Regions:
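Short, acidic/polar
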Residues: 45-61, 133-144, 196-205, 286-296
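Aromatic-lined substrate-binding rim segments of carbohydrate-active enzymes
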Residues: 25-28, 52-118, 166-193, 207, ...
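N-terminal Sec-pathway targeting helices
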Residues: 1-15
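Conserved, mostly hydrophobic/aromatic
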Residues: 67, 95, 141, 154, ...
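Hydrophobic faces of well-ordered beta-strands that scaffold small-molecule active sites
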Residues: 33-39, 67-69, 102-106, 152-156, ...
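Glycoside hydrolase catalytic-domain groove-lining segments
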Residues: 180-181, 185-273, 323-329
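Substrate-binding cleft of secreted/luminal carbohydrate-active enzymes
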Residues: 107, 152, 257-334
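Active-site groove signature of glycoside hydrolases
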Residues: 73, 109-114, 134-169, 306
């Protein structure tokens, strides 16, 4: 009991220190920041949008120059052994035309609900067979795009150590290492491994990464508690960065690049966004919260930040007569 008491006191002291430290931290200058977005074709379709129209608007109206694209397994291999890269080709080719830089994510666990994305034809396969098919899809994807100079990073899986979120099998660390090794064997560009910013410890993901990506969320909805705002100052991320370096051997060596792979810039409610009223959407992400999160990320000290929710901003502008998010991003961020 005494040890637990000492541990609690230590946590409270650190927490108090982080808030004091936070008062002395300035936002990184805008000209030092590199901003990007994540684009998800299935999410754009779910919102009732023409996915090509919004994608081109991201590139031409927002003028985004850094974009994370996703090679969803069910989309690129809809039938076993039959690959269809046409939609992903379109996304990559249009980005290349505009001199945008790309992160290309591959794997089973990728952005957007249900987090793990598998083709329907794998439903009755055992895990061993399924994993072999997964490696085949990853290899096909990397080989197809390895000559694209605009791709600056590969991302292997998305938050693979966040095992209690999403409809996913438990992460097999040995198999994850196999995926990473496969990508390294096919191309020399850095591999991103990402982890949750608030509740994960980063060490397992960071030690496997060439570039480490953290998520950054401020307001979430969690059953049975409802809406919850993380009571964390931006210095929490600076502290976590420092501590994780100790355990990965980076403190006195060459530190790895750390980026914010997902900065919350859309709602997180009890249901998918399309089922929420506009009023309910704004509970977890209103315009002031949107701007506040961008400032929060700049104070956290990471110079490369990918905003999460560009499809929603466009939906607000086109379907809900609420253009402020899109216009702010256009004039102040990109």
């Amino acid at each position: 009991f005494q040890i637990l008491l000492y541990l609690l006191v230590l946590i409270l002291v650190i927490y108090f220190f982080l808030w004091i430290w936070n008062f002395f931290i300035d936002e990184l200058p805008q000209d030092q920041m590199v901003y990007g977005v994540t684009f998800s074709k299935p999410y754009a379709v779910e919102l009732g949008l023409d996915w090509k129209e919004i994608y081109l608007a991201i590139l031409d109206d927002l003028k985004v120059k850094n974009i994370r694209l996703i090679a969803y397994w069910p989309e690129v291999e809809p039938k076993e052994g039959k690959f269809d890269f046409r939609d992903l080709d379109f996304q990559i080719n249009e980005a290349v035309k505009r001199n945008a830089k790309i992160i290309l994510a591959v794997g089973r666990r990728l952005p957007r609900w249900p987090e793990c994305h598998e083709p329907s034809w794998t439903l009755n396969q055992n895990l061993e067979v399924k994993n072999e098919k997964l490696l085949e899809y990853i290899e096909k994807t990397i080989l197809r795009y390895k000559e694209v100079e605009a791709i600056k990073y590969w991302q292997v899986e998305n938050e693979p150590f966040l095992m209690r979120f999403g409809i996913c099998p438990k992460t097999n660390i040995e198999f994850l290492d196999k995926e990473i090794a496969l990508v390294h064997s096919l191309d020399s560009r850095p591999v991103i491994i990402s982890d949750n910013g608030e509740v994960s410890i980063w060490i397992n993901a960071r030690k496997r990464a060439d570039v480490f990506g953290t998520t950054m969320y401020r307001v979430i909805w969690k059953k049975p508690f409802g809406y919850f705002r993380y009571p964390l100052p931006s210095t929490f991320f600076r502290f976590k960065d420092f501590v994780s370096k100790i355990f990965t051997g980076e403190l006195f060596g060459q530190p790895k690049k750390v980026i914010v792979i997902e900065l919350q810039a859309e709602p997180w409610g009890p249901e998918v966004t399309t089922r929420l009223t506009l009023e309910e959407q704004f509970v977890s992400m209103d315009f002031e919260g949107f701007k506040g999160n961008i400032g929060y990320a700049r104070r956290a000290g990471f110079k490369e930040v990918y905003l999460w929710g560009v499809e929603w901003w466009y939906w607000l502008k086109e379907k809900a007569n609420e253009p402020r998010f899109w216009e702010f991003a256009k004039s102040k961020i990109f």
